[in-house]
């Protein structure tokens, strides 16, 4: 169990208020002792909100393994009936996580203002996997899975007082923050969309941090970042997990400095990604100023449709978008293959990105929730299970569509509407989740793509793809142009498959 040696110092049930200078700056219990003038032999004491009979005690003296409030699960020790609030619960990830956590006996609450539904509607598109109204989803979750979700319709930016009241009511022990606009193209449409995304994402998160400081400072924040914060440095510098490792050194002329623990450089690739970088600094500073605790989840591109919970009944399905604003690349490729649109590669298609399946992303989030950071700790994980060139992904989708489902799939290169390097080095470091949190991928790329074909080829869903097929090819250019991209080349599939298989033999992926 990855978290068995964690202590009450990590636990959100700890009550430090009035016992120590909890709002002091610093990053560790040693700093607490130093600031309070405590000698090594002195005790740092706290109380437990769940076990008041303990009175004042040393929070380092009880581990999760020893505490009766923490029970074994397949993902580590979990706090009994842990209260988790999901912000953005109506979305692709939020709804999936709510059902996933509910099935593990977490007490799930959530908020949403249905922005995602409205943004996709603005594009003229819809989720190709039909989803119900929230009231019907909540009823189905209770009826099918026995999960009761406490939901409120709240805009976290513009209805902060409502959010305050809900947090005071629920007293969440962890908050998962998915309530941001997650689209690079949406942020590049025009000045109004760019300003909206910056305001919605950055100020919404900043307001949340102040509420956590005032209401639930012992709770942990699991904040969704993005691998896109790092960009794709042409120097080939590794994409470390948010901060430089302890032994990293900066050399200049005849001098050198330690970089250990410093935030790594960011090179965002859209105004959306800029908003995520600003979030990173705001969350980092809040942990430093107020002893909040947070994990920044630098997530790769998520793909897929399956978890046991969303597959249990059509009413429990999560959304799946394929339009140019909100459709992610693998999801879009599968939809294109099904309705006969050549899979679209931007430019050369040699861009490399990190990816993770929906089910594995849920596993990762669970492991982070039940392994809270220490007070004042800002932790970062790069949440991916592998990385691939988009060209290789197109071939993988085409092969499965052709060999398993009898589809005639083509691949095309189109103009790249984005400002990005087509060919670049890419060395992501993604060690924290497996080494510190016990994560092991449970589903292969090919298996999840196969599942997607199975679902999206159902007649009703295929028809929904057909209805919105004209919204797949991009018209939003980083330059501000408003026109559909032109085709540069139709790639000969058999030659591309042969090239791909030779590459697999040499490199392994």
Label each residue range with its predicted role.
Residues 1-73:
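Cysteine-centered metal-binding/redox modules
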Residues 67, 208, 283, 333, ...:
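Structural element of the ATP-grasp superfamily
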Residues 73-306, 503-509:
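N-terminal Rossmann-like NAD(P)+-binding domain of SDR-like oxidoreductases, especially those catalyzing
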Residues 103, 147, 337-509:
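C-terminal substrate-binding subdomain of Rossmann-fold SDR/epimerase-dehydratase oxidoreductases
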Residues 205, 209, 283, 330, ...:
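Short-chain dehydrogenase/reductase
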Residues 277, 290-292, 304-331, 341, ...:
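Glycine/proline-rich active-site loop of Rossmann-fold NAD(P)-dependent oxidoreductases
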Residues 278-286, 333, 393, 397:
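Hydrophobic alpha-helix immediately C-terminal to the catalytic Tyr-X-X-X-Lys motif of short-chain
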């Amino acid at each position: 169990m990855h978290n068995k040696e964690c202590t009450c110092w990590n636990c959100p049930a700890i009550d430090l208020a009035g016992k120590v200078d909890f709002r002091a700056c610093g990053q560790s219990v040693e700093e607490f002792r130093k600031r309070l003038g405590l000698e090594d032999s002195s005790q740092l004491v706290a109380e437990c909100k769940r076990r008041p009979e303990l009175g004042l005690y040393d929070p380092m003296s009880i581990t999760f393994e020893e505490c009766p409030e923490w029970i074994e699960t397949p993902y580590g020790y979990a706090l009994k009936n842990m209260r988790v609030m999901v912000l953005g619960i109506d979305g692709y990830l939020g709804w999936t996580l709510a059902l996933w956590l509910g099935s593990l006996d977490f007490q799930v609450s959530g908020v949403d203002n249905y922005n995602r539904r409205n943004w996709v509607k603005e594009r003229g598109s819809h989720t190709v996997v039909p989803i119900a109204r929230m009231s019907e989803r909540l009823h189905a979750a209770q009826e099918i899975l026995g999960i009761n979700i406490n939901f409120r319709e709240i805009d976290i930016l513009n209805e902060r007082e409502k959010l305050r009241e809900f947090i005071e009511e629920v007293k969440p022990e962890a908050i998962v923050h998915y309530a941001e606009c997650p689209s690079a193209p949406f942020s590049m449409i025009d000045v109004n969309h760019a300003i909206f995304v910056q305001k919605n994402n950055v100020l919404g998160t900043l307001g949340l941090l102040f509420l956590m400081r005032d209401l639930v400072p012992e709770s942990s924040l699991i904040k969704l970042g993005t691998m896109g914060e790092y960009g794709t440095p042409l120097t080939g510098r590794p994409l470390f997990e948010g901060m430089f490792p302890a032994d990293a050194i900066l050399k200049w002329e005849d001098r050198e400095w330690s970089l250990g623990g410093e935030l790594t450089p960011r090179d965002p690739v859209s105004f959306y990604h800029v908003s995520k970088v600003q979030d990173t600094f705001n969350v980092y500073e809040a942990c430093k100023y107020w002893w909040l605790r947070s994990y920044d989840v630098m997530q790769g591109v998520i793909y897929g449709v399956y978890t046991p919970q969303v597959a249990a009944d059509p009413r429990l399905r999560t959304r799946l978008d394929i339009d140019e604003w909100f459709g992610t690349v693998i999801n879009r490729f599968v939809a294109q293959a099904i309705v006969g649109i050549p899979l679209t590669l931007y430019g050369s298609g040699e861009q490399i990105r990190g990816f993770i399946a929906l089910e594995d992303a849920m596993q990762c989030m669970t492991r982070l929730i039940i392994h809270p950071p220490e007070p004042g700790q800002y932790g970062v994980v790069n949440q991916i299970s592998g990385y691939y060139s988009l060209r290789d992904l197109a071939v993988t989708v085409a092969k499965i569509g052709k060999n398993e489902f009898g589809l005639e799939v083509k691949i095309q290169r189109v103009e790249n509407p984005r400002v990005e390097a087509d060919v670049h080095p890419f060395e992501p470091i993604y060690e924290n989740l497996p080494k510190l949190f016990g994560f092991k991928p449970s589903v292969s790329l090919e298996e999840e793509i196969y599942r997607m074909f199975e679902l999206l080829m159902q007649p009703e869903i295929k028809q929904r793809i057909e209805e919105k097929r004209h919204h797949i090819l991009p018209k939003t250019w980083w330059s501000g142009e408003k026109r559909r991209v032109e085709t540069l080349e139709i790639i000969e599939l058999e030659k591309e498959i042969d090239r791909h298989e030779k590459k697999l033999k040499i490199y392994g992926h």
